[in-house]
Amino acid sequence: MRITEANPDPDAKAVPAAAAPSTASDAAAAAAATAATAAAAAAATAATAAAAAAATAATAAKAAALTAANAAAAAAATAAAAARG
């Protein structure tokens, strides 16, 4: 007895010719995806740079405040030592 496939797989669906993407549309989609990726990378880089600049500014402000506090403490200690003679 010879077995033949009389009933093809019902889940297999043929792709209509109109749905098949053309080379031009593939290239356009790839270009759009590349542009979107580049834009996202640029935005992430800008956000990272802004965060780094803010952190650097905050660190500089803290360092300046500590330096001023240390200078004031040193001046007070010097004045106290001078007052003691």
From Swiss-Prot:
This is Ice-structuring protein 4. GO terms for cellular component: extracellular region. Contributes to protect fish blood from freezing at subzero sea water temperatures. Lowers the blood freezing point. Binds to nascent ice crystals and prevents further growth. It comes from the Eukaryota. It is found in: Secreted. Keywords: Antifreeze protein, Repeat, Secreted, Signal. Residues 1-21 form the signal peptide. The keyword Oxidoreductase does not apply. One of its GO terms (molecular function) is antifreeze activity. Belongs to the type-I AFP family. The keyword Secreted applies. InterPro entries: Antifreeze_1.
